[in-house]
């Protein structure tokens, strides 16, 4: 297997956000879970996956926390400069991947999703790579969904059967995602995740159902839930 085969994947982790909703003294990716930071859990899960050759982490310039982590000195972990928005950070990571010809496929994963399971990544790769475009892990919406007015009143009920929660990882060819993000940023388009950039180019990325416990830590109460899931995952691997 060579570095440029589809069986070699580079993970990109945008980790330049501040996580203001957590109301913590540091960005949420550096909060502790079971003795390690959220970011350490996330990166370790990615590095342990056999097909991931490198993890490219986009960090804010001057970030005082990342250099203190043990994994910051791991040769498989590459730091690049993060940007103001998520798309800028991912594009920075993609530039490194292309410049060094690391892989034809990239897998973008949220820094604040430490509970990703290898079984979900296996499923994503198996269903997406034959399509030659890309796709994302996602979870079908379970709750009844309401469309609100500006006054925060219910305007109508939305058919949830066609709605999915977008998760990560999101897996695309390096060249296509680079082109999509670069074009979207140049045109000042709204890019909320990698798949939205691909959609703006006229493609339809595949939805691959993943586990709902692959949560993104956003609110303070999410930390306890993530800690529970991580402990459960640890017991299952024993």
Swiss-Prot record:
Top EC class, one word: transferase
Keyword Transferase among UniProt keywords: yes
Stored Gene3D superfamilies: Spore Coat Polysaccharide Biosynthesis Protein SpsA, Chain A
PROSITE patterns: ISPD (PS01295)
GO MF term set: 2-C-methyl-D-erythritol 4-phosphate cytidylyltransferase activity
GO biological process, one term: isopentenyl diphosphate biosynthetic process, methylerythritol 4-phosphate pathway
Annotated positions for site Transition state stabilizer: 21, 28
Pathway terms, separated by semicolons: Isoprenoid biosynthesis; isopentenyl diphosphate biosynthesis via DXP pathway; isopentenyl diphosphate from 1-deoxy-D-xylulose 5-phosphate: step 2/6
Pfam families reported for this sequence: IspD
Protein role: Catalyzes the formation of 4-diphosphocytidyl-2-C-methyl-D-erythritol from CTP and 2-C-methyl-D-erythritol 4-phosphate (MEP).
Name assigned to this protein: 2-C-methyl-D-erythritol 4-phosphate cytidylyltransferase
Species this protein is from: Aliivibrio fischeri (strain ATCC 700601 / ES114)
């Amino acid at each position: 297997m060579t570095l440029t085969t589809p069986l070699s994947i580079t993970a990109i982790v945008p980790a330049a956000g501040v996580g203001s909703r957590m109301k913590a003294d540091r960005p949420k990716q550096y909060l502790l879970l079971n003795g390690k930071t959220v970011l350490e859990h996330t990166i370790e899960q990615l590095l342990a996956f056999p097909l991931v050759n490198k993890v490219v982490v986009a960090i804010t310039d001057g970030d005082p926390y990342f250099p203190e982590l043990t994994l910051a000195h791991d040769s498989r972990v590459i730091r690049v400069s993060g940007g103001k928005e998520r798309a800028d950070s991912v594009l920075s990571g993609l530039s490194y991947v292309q410049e060094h010809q690391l892989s034809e496929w990239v897998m973008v994963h949220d820094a604040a999703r430490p509970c990703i399971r290898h079984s979900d990544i296996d499923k994503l790769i198996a269903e997406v790579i034959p399509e030659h475009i890309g796709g994302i892990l996602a979870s079908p919406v379970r709750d009844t969904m309401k469309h609100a007015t500006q006054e925060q009143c219910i305007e109508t009920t939305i058919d949830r059967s066609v709605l999915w929660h977008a998760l990560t990882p999101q897996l695309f060819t390096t060249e296509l995602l680079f082109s999509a993000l670069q074009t979207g940023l140049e045109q000042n388009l709204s890019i909320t995740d990698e798949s939205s950039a691909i959609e703006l180019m006229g493609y339809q990325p595949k939805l691959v159902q993943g586990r709902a416990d692959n949560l993104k830590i956003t609110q303070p109460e999410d930390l306890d839930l993530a800690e529970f899931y991580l402990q459960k995952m640890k017991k299952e691997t024993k």
